Amino acid sequence: PPSSDLDAVVRDADIVILATPSAYLKDFLAPLTVPLRDKFVVSAIKGIVPGDYQTVVEYIHDHYGLSYRQIGLVTGPSHAEEVSRGKLSYLTVVCADPENARRIGERFAGENICFSYSADLYGVEYAAILKNIYALSVGIAVGLGYGDNFLAVLIANAAGEMTRFLEESYPDERNTQVSAYLGDLLVTCYSTYSRNRRLGLLIGHGCTVKSALNEMTMVAEGYFAADCIRHINFRHRVDMPIADMVYRVLYEGASARRCMQELTTKLI
C-alpha cells in the first residue's frame, strides 16, 4: 500500500525507484536509515545533484555503496502524459549489468511501451540531463519569435554539442543518433508537454527568470542542470555555446535576446 514512511517502503522493496527532482534528492533521502546496499536502485531522474555536481547514479554509488551493476536508469523519449493516455511510447533501460536491465524492463512492461537496452550509464544519463538545457534554449528561441528554420539549426547544433561533450568527457563506443540520446532530445525540445521548453518560452516572452520559475507548476530540471553542467565542464573545457548561453540568461541576468543573437553567429 502507498506509504510516506521511507524506511518502511525501502525495507520491503527489492527494487527502489527514485523519481524526485534532483535538487531535492539529498533532502528526500536524508531520513533513510535502511541500507540500500542490498537493493537495486532505478533512477528516473534527469538531473544532477546540486552542490555535489554528480549525476544521480554517481551520487548513489558514492554515498550509498552500491555497485554500478546495482543501479539502473529509465529514460525516454517519453512524456508521462502520453504514457498515461495509452500512446505508444519507447523507454530505454540502462544498467552496467544487461540481465538487471532486462529485469527492470520486465517490471515496466505494458501494452503500449517498447524497450531498448543500454550499458552506457554515463552517456545516457548525461544526455538526459543536457537535453533539458537544450529544450530551455528552444523555448527561449520560440518566445523571442524565431521560426522553425532556426529551431532546426539550433536543435541540430544541440545534438552535436551533446555528442561532443560525451565524447570528450567520457569516450566510449556509443551511437548518439538513437532514441536514448537524439530521440529524447527531440521530444523534449519540441513537445508542448516539456517543462523545460515551457520555462524557456516564458523567459523568451519577457518574464524574468524568477517570475518564470514562479509560473511553473512542476520542476524544470534544466534550470538546475545549467548551473551544474557549467561547473562540471570547468574540468573538461568542452566548447558548449548553447549551454553557456542558457547559463548566462538564467544565472547572470544576461538579455535573452542579445544572447540568442550572439549564439546565431556560432551555429552551423
Mark where each language-model region is.
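Rossmann-like NAD(P)(H) cofactor-binding subdomain of soluble oxidoreductases
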Residues: 3-11, 15-86, 104-106
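Fold-independent oxyanion-binding glycine-rich loops
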Residues: 5, 20-21, 44-46, 74-77, ...
